[in-house]
Amino acid sequence: MTKIVFYRSQGIFYGFEEIGHVGFGEWGEDPFCAMLSSITMYIVDAIEEVYGARVDYRIDEEKARITVRSKAALPEFEEDDRVRFAVSGLFLTYYTMLEDMLLHDDMYEFTKDSGFRVTVEDRDYE
């Protein structure tokens, strides 16, 4: 089971943390884990390379934990509206996509110990 916690401040998404393995397939052959990893790195690369903003990310392979946050999504840290909206939009889009997948979870054959859970924490950027 993968737990994904999105971070939001004053209604604006600025990051997330993914913990665990989806468990749909064997480790290293799980298409859902591959999808989450690909989207995560897409977000990191887009923030850094496309928008030229800073992104803080940590990968702990032993604990199967990835944390991604960017101050550029928040108005108190980023003056350029275009960058801020683009960065926060990446996080919001990822959240919405996962929520949509959960609405249609009957399409996937997860066991009781596999799958993913999505939550949102309202908290200031630390």
Residue ranges and their predicted role:
Residues 1-30, 45-126:
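N-terminal intrinsically disordered, cationic/polar leader segments
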Residues 35-38, 42-47:
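Alpha-helical support elements that line or immediately flank enzyme active sites
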